[in-house]
C-alpha cells in the first residue's frame, strides 16, 4: 500500500513528484490538498473513501472552505467518514453538507475517576503563570501538558517558564507542520518537560505516559475539561489533574461538578512548598539530522552510528523519529554534546549529514 503525506510547510516539488506516481492513500492538511487541486497536481475523481478526521479542529482553524473544495473535487458516489471530538453547530452544518443520510455513532468519554486525582486551586487572573511554576516546582512531573484558552497566553506562559529554567514549548494553531512535528517529537521523547497548548492544537496528541495535566484556564465546555484530564492516568498509571480557577470561572467549575455528580476538591496554593532542587530539567536532549526517509536513512543506521563510533550504550539513546527529510534522536542529556560533536565530524551509514 502506497501512502503519501501532503502537509503545508513541506516543499511542494517532492510532493508533486510523488503524486505523479500515484498513491492508494493520501493523508494531508486541507490547505495543502486544496493547493494541489488548484495546481492540477492531484486528481480526486476516483476517490472511494473520504475521511474527515478531527473535523471540529479543522473548522476551528478556519478550514471550512478548503474542506468544502476538497469534497467538491471527489465523486458524489463515495463513502465519507467524519470524526469529531465535539459536535457544535459548525460540525452539524458540515455533516449536513458533506454526508448523505449519515449514521451517527457516539462514544461517551469515560475515565476512571479513581485513577485521576483532581485538585483545584483558586488564583487571581494575573497570578496564573506564577501558579503554574509553583505547581511544577512542587509536583515535579517529568511530562506535563498545560492547557491555555488562547494561543497568546500559550506563547507568554511558555516564555515565562523557559526564563525560570523549565524546558517548555508552546503548541498552538497556525504553526507550520514542520514546527509542530519538532515540538511533538521533543515532548514525546522527553526532551521537553512542559507542553503549553491550546485545546485545538493538542487534538490527536497521543502521549502514553503523562505525569500531569494543568488547566491554566478552566474550560467553559465540560467535555473539553474531561478530554484534557483524560490524557493523564492512562492504562494502569495514576493521573494528576491540576486546575487553576479565577473567581469569575467558578460557574464553569459548577458545570464540571454537575457533570461528575459530585463536588471538586479545593486546595490552597500557599501550602505548596517547592520540592528539593531547582526546576526539573528534561532528561533527554533531541539532536536533529538533516536527512530522512528520502535519503534512505533508517533508525537502525543512526543507532549503529551512536553505539559504534560515538560510543554510546543503547540505554543512552531514546526514541528515533525519521521523517521524509529530517531525523530526530533523543539522547541522555549528559551525553548529548559528545554525540553532537562526534556525529558532526563523523558519518552515518558512510555519509555525512548536517546537524
Segments the model singles out, each with a brief description of its role:
Residues 1-355:
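Conserved helicase RecA-like core
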